[in-house]
């Protein structure tokens, strides 16, 4: 960020499976390549807020030189999307979900001692949570689930209405799936009674590649593979067939959630795969019978606790 703010070339170390000892690969970007002789406009370096789920990572980032980070988003395992895996050996409950324990709880007192601002995320979408977060030393909270189903979000109106109607009937569930994501990280998957795509089989196609993994081929060149791509292709690229079990194509399905799912020559459109935080199962308390609401209503709801505390 320091380099880019000055329009200078920068690079990041690239994670590549199978690199021989002593070999390092980087991703490099030189902004000058894209200015085509023009004079770049002065920009301000943006703040870097790192999403973390452990004290050790926060401490390492806070002490890192070269500008480092300006704050933290402390995300718990109840948050939607990808979750950090439990520390230590992963143990699953009877529902096949990772079990999180005391080792996965971030010590907020230690975070506060680092002297950087932080926000809490995951299960924070309740009026009383903002006050509790501030009492613990946080600047505020990060809320995803409530905003994800608001009128202003990118989810299709049909999808939001279907989920909220199911939630009002108590017919929605959120599962932490240890296999769905090709990254290997646990991923929250929503199931609900009104899901029109439930049970529809999908042909394995990998053509977006946002979650692919870089690896070294036999000829020493770098290529990419994905555990959600066609199994034969993945294995031919040196992947372990066991890694393909239970994988879903997050790239295409998440695009379908926002109404830009691809249409295939075979005659089908990519189906949706919804992710959300655990609090979706309790959203009926906020809805109070509604099947739509605005982002403004969410903000007013979240601030109600602090307003009441000041009154």
Give the residues covered by each predicted segment:
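Hydrophobic faces of well-ordered beta-strands that scaffold small-molecule active sites
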Residues: 48-50, 72-74, 118-122, 141-143
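Alpha-helix initiation/capping motif
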Residues: 54, 125-126, 151, 156, ...
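Glycine-rich phosphate-binding active-site loops on the catalytic face of alpha/beta enzymes
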Residues: 1, 74-83, 127-159
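Surface cap/lid and interfacial helix-loop subdomains adjacent to catalytic sites
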Residues: 102-113, 125, 135-136, 147, ...
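Glycine-rich beta-to-alpha transition loops that act as phosphate-gripper elements at the mouths
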Residues: 50-56, 116-129
């Amino acid at each position: 960020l320091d380099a880019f703010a000055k329009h200078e070339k920068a690079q990041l170390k690239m994670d590549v499976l199978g690199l021989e000892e002593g070999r390092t690969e980087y991703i490099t970007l030189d902004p000058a390549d894209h200015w085509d002789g023009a004079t770049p406009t002065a920009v301000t370096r943006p703040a870097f807020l790192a999403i973390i789920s452990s004290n050790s990572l926060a401490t390492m980032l806070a002490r890192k030189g070269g500008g480092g980070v300006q704050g933290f988003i402390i995300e718990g395992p109840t948050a939607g999307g990808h979750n950090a895996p439990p520390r230590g050996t992963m143990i699953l409950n009877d529902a096949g979900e990772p079990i999180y324990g005391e080792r996965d709880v971030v010590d907020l007192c230690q975070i506060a001692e680092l002297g950087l601002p932080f926000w809490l995320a995951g299960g924070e979408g309740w009026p009383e949570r903002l006050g509790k977060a501030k009492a613990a030393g946080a600047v505020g909270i990060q809320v995803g689930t409530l905003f994800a189903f608001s009128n202003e979000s990118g989810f299709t109106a049909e999808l939001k209405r279907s989920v909220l109607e199911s939630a009002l009937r108590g017919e929605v569930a959120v599962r932490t799936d240890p296999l769905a994501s090709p990254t290997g990280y646990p991923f929250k998957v929503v199931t609900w009674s009104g899901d029109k795509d439930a049970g529809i089989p999908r042909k394995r196609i990998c053509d977006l590649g946002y979650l692919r993994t870089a690896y070294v081929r036999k000829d020493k060149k770098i290529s990419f593979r994905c555990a959600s791509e066609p199994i034969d292709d993945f294995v031919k690229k040196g992947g372990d067939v066991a890694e393909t079990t239970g994988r879903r194509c997050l790239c295409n399905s998440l695009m379908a959630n926002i109404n830009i799912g691809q249409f295939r020559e075979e005659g089908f459109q990519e189906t949706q795969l919804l992710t959300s935080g655990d609090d979706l199962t309790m959203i009926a308390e906020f809805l109070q019978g509604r099947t739509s609401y605005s982002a403004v209503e969410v903000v007013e709801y979240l601030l109600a606790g602090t307003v009441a505390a000041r009154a």
